[in-house]
């Protein structure tokens, strides 16, 4: 089986100092010249940090808590993934061009690769981040289900690649730090996955207020109910079961696996954890952003 898997650097390559999927960068001019609109809302995460969760919450806010409207289509059609390109199957730019305003735009890009038009049009941006140890666990399982991705081999080997920034979208450290710098702009809201798990009501209200809407109790209740982990895991519009099996193998692992804080404890042997934490401290010592790896 493994011999038929694509080689790692056949699929991914260095792009302006960031490891990227070559399918995405093949048509980079389309991304770079993308024309943002002033009322676009950009939702940014490093991969496996809760983009589907926060995206569904934001879409519920835009649709004023109308669950049926949110169930009219898969999330990847309602919130197009800007740089995603899989030849004829998925084209985020094309989807966005065809969307009426106001658009919600998803991206995993580090700040330096974001199309300039988002800054020029002064678009609102939500950046959601998650602690690195849980991200790497979730990313490992994601690698196992994406058909075009190479076999990640052992978890410890994947962690080494993650620490080196040799996974798609590059270094987690650089990504977080680049967006933290941008969050000094009042149009950028910097959020934490762990805060959402701790007190979802507080964080939903924060999102609603950032989007300059009224956080009515009834709306907040509907959003919390509809975007609970179990609801989203069972919802075909959010669990990625609408993607063709040629792209994703959900029999290996569900797209929405656990949705908890601290699952890293079930995967990191002690020696690997110590090595990871030493590496983490070295790279984050000058960054004021503090993460919680457990609640």
From Swiss-Prot:
Q: List the active-site residues.
A: 108
**Residues binding substrate, per UniProt:** 106-108
Tell me the Pfam families matching this sequence: Sulfotransfer_1 (PF00685)
Where is this protein found? Cytoplasm, Cytosol
Tissues showing expression = Liver of young mature males and uterus.
Q: Which of the residues bear the PTM Phosphoserine?
A: 156
Q: Which reaction does it catalyse?
A: estrone + 3'-phosphoadenylyl sulfate = estrone 3-sulfate + adenosine 3',5'-bisphosphate + H(+); (24S)-hydroxycholesterol + 3'-phosphoadenylyl sulfate = (24S)-hydroxycholesterol 3-sulfate + adenosine 3',5'-bisphosphate + H(+); 17beta-estradiol + 3'-phosphoadenylyl sulfate = 17beta-estradiol 3-sulfate + adenosine 3',5'-bisphosphate + H(+); 3beta-hydroxyandrost-5-en-17-one + 3'-phosphoadenylyl sulfate = dehydroepiandrosterone 3-sulfate + adenosine 3',5'-bisphosphate + H(+)
The record's induction entry says: Induced by androgens and suppressed by estrogens. The expression is under the influence of pituitary growth hormone and thyroid hormone. Is regulated by progesterone in the uterus.
Q: Where does 3'-phosphoadenylyl sulfate bind?
A: 48-53, 130, 138, 193, 227-232, 257-259
Q: Name one GO molecular function term.
A: steroid sulfotransferase activity
Could you tell me what this protein does? Sulfotransferase that utilizes 3'-phospho-5'-adenylyl sulfate (PAPS) as sulfonate donor to catalyze the sulfate conjugation of estradiol and estrone. Is a key enzyme in estrogen homeostasis, the sulfation of estrogens leads to their inactivation. Also sulfates dehydroepiandrosterone (DHEA), pregnenolone, (24S)-hydroxycholesterol and xenobiotic compounds like ethinylestradiol, equalenin, diethyl stilbesterol and 1-naphthol at significantly lower efficiency. Does not sulfonate cortisol, testosterone and dopamine. May play a role in gut microbiota-host metabolic interaction.
Name of the featured protein: Sulfotransferase 1E1
Q: Where does this protein come from, organism-wise?
A: Rattus norvegicus
Q: What is the lineage of its organism?
A: Eukaryota, Metazoa, Chordata, Craniata, Vertebrata
């Amino acid at each position: 089986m493994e011999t038929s898997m694509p080689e790692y650097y056949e699929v991914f390559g260095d792009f302006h100092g960031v490891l990227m999927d070559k399918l995405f960068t093949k048509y980079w001019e389309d991304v770079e010249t993308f024309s943002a609109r002033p009322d676009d809302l950009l939702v940014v995460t490093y991969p496996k940090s809760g983009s589907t969760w926060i995206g569904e919450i934001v879409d519920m806010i835009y649709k004023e808590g109308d669950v049926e409207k949110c169930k009219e289509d898969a999330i990847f059609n309602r919130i197009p993934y800007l740089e995603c390109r899989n030849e004829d199957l998925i084209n985020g730019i094309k989807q966005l061009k065809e969307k009426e305003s106001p658009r919600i735009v998803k991206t995993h890009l580090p700040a330096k690769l974001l199309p300039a038009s988002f800054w020029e049009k002064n678009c609102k941006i939500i950046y959601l981040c998650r602690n690195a140890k849980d991200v790497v666990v979730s990313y490992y399982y994601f690698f196992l289900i994406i058909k075009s991705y190479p076999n990640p081999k052992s978890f410890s080997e994947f962690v080494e690649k993650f620490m080196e920034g040799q996974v798609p979208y590059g270094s987690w450290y650089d990504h977080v730090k680049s967006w933290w710098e941008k969050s000094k702009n009042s149009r950028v809201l910097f959020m934490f996955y762990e805060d959402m798990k701790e007190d979802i009501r507080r964080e939903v209200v924060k999102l609603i207020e950032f989007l300059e809407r009224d956080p009515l109790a009834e709306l907040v209740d509907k959003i919390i109910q509809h975007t609970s982990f179990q609801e989203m895991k069972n919802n075909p519009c959010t669990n990625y079961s609408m993607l063709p099996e040629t792209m994703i193998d959900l029999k290996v692992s569900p797209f929405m696996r656990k949705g908890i804080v601290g699952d890293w404890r079930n995967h990191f042997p002690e020696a690997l954890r110590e090595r990871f934490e030493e590496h983490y401290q070295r790279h984050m010592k000058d960054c004021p952003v503090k993460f919680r790896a457990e609640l």
